[in-house]
Amino acid sequence: MKVTVIGAGNVGATVAECVARQDVAKEVVMVDIKDGMPQGKALDMRESSPIHGFDTRVTGTNDYGPTEDSDVCIITAGLPRSPGMSRDDLLAKNTEIVGGVTEQFVEGSPDSTIIVVANPLDVMTYVAYEASGFPTNRVMGMAGVLDTGRFRSFIAEELDVSVRDVQALLMGGHGDTMVPLPRYTTVGGIPVPQLIDDARIEEIVERTKGAGGEIVDLMGTSAWYAPGAAAAEMTEAILKDNKRILPCAAYCDGEYGLDDLFIGVPVKLGAGGVEEVIEVDLDADEKAQLKTSAGHVHSNLDDLQRLRDEGKIG
């Protein structure tokens, strides 16, 4: 099996290393426009393979020929918002990047599954879906696994328990409007509201929503370890056909009353990509929060269409 990672920056390289160390794929190919960057990082990873004990071959390239016949592609390419850059400028630029790399990749791998990591996540997943021409089950975004991981980490810290015993569910868009669901969160099978009072749970929820920004404030750049690990977990579920139940940005066509958008929902993830969108019962407040989150995603999609109509995106 072959996995392609587009973008050899911090997130892309971390994804590549995590997938290689899983030893599930025969080959991991990193693609980047910067000459020497993917080749050097790939060589470094190969030299670590005897120490970590994996046989996956990691290679780097500046063109898409070596990516042919990939089973999974993780798109990490994209720009962060820089000082002076408007939100429209960022959306336009990343749409061009994600759309362009998707078109180049799918020429040689028409039967692959695509995982999008680039931001704004929910919109970029839609862009990749359009550019690929793939069915909706073979395009998804990585957000829920990351955000849920952060939520689980904070709960484990609060209770001083192993993260392995914390299971959680989080839905909605990737950002401030995400919807953590404490009543679907358990520690060793015990519902977390029985272990943590409501006020403290709400504080943990708010920290989860701002977790990405917390890291940016500390380092001056965005996270890469947790996003890389999250994308690798999704990749493993697909390659192994594990039928994992994970929250992903998946296409909704009536599920949860949502239509024509990619948004975080629990899915069954296996060899067929998103094999099922799982609908759980939501109370009135949770439904309202999810509707608000979906409205934010639709607003971003409207902005995307406006920029296209204005000729700012090719």
From Swiss-Prot:
It comes from the Bacteria. Its EC number is 1.1.1.37. It catalyses: (S)-malate + NAD(+) = oxaloacetate + NADH + H(+). Keywords: NAD, Oxidoreductase, Tricarboxylic acid cycle. Substrate binds at residues 81, 87, 119, 150. NAD(+) binds at residues 7-12, 32, 94, 117-119. SUPFAM superfamilies: LDH C-terminal domain-like, NAD(P)-binding Rossmann-fold domains. One of its GO terms (biological process) is tricarboxylic acid cycle. The active site is at residue 174. GO terms for molecular function: L-lactate dehydrogenase activity; L-malate dehydrogenase (NAD+) activity. Coiled coil: none annotated. Belongs to the LDH/MDH superfamily. MDH type 3 family. NCBIfam families: MalateDH_bact, PRK06223.1. Catalyzes the reversible oxidation of malate to oxaloacetate. This is Malate dehydrogenase. The lineage of its organism: Bacteria, Pseudomonadati, Rhodothermota, Rhodothermia, Rhodothermales. The gene is mdh.
